[in-house]
Amino acid sequence: MVRIEAVYDGNLRCSATHIPSGQTLVTDAPVDNMGKGQSFSPTDLLATSMLNCMMTIIAIAADSRELDVSGMSGSVEKHMASGPRRVSKLSLIHI
């Protein structure tokens, strides 16, 4: 179990703390959704989580085969839809 605590800071911005490590991240609503766009949006983190999860799983598999994947990089595109506003597609560009 991992506990994460979040606080709404106002102005469509939230701070979330990963309790085991004490690390905090901030989300901000994007400009096209009434925010300032000064940080990752919650849906940006959804796309980031998918990409980072895939790269982590690849690294775990590589480590078990004694392969070095240091420097591996990837890219994902997030597509949004409206009515209701939602993520419509996550496109993995490359790993």
Q: Where does each model-flagged region fall?
A:
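Helix-adjacent hinge/juxtasegments
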Residues: 59-76
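Glycine- and acidic-rich phosphate- and metal-coordinating loops
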Residues: 74, 90-91
